[in-house]
Amino acid sequence: MDSEYITWIDISLRPTDTCTLIPFLKDMESHLGFKYSEIVADAGYESEENYLFIEGNGQTAYIKPQNYEISKTRKYKKDISRRENMEYHADRDSYICRNGRELTVTNERRSKTASGSVSVKTYYRSPDCTGCPYKTECIKGNNCKTPMEKRNKVLMVSKTMSQKRAEDLERITSEYGTMLRMNRSIQAEGSFADVKEDMNFRRYLYRGKAN
């Protein structure tokens, strides 16, 4: 959307929005012959891969983080299991939990997306959570076969994603970023409403993309 005009549209076989953003931007740029300097999108499009692509393409992301709304709730802010609510010590690259125990780096793992993008996850572990009074609040996952009394706290963190999300959050909460998000909501949702109501469209049924 640009000034209430639909400048580009696409259909995708992918069930989620996350994986559709990069192909959409590439396709739009190749057909229009130019690229927008700012990419404004809702939370469904947030991912580490999308952040890195937009930055590498010389553009600026204004994407609403997936945890943006829930992060403002009291429940989220009081959830001691979340790393966001723990103390982080950059000099030691470690987290301090509610009970004052230190979670240090034990290993890193690399994973690859369907498109070939590689993400690095850093694992932080507490050496011993025995006798911790906050254990059931802090360690989640009832399907784990290891008994609770034998389990220790583990955090899995993508440092790149955390950094890009923090940078993006600063942008979208600025006066300019807030204006862009409001404008996106008005234009995109308004146009969608026009198509449904004024043109009386309810559902699109296609067999493949060829037709």
List PLM regions with ranges.
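Anion-binding and metal-coordination hotspots
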Residues: 1-211
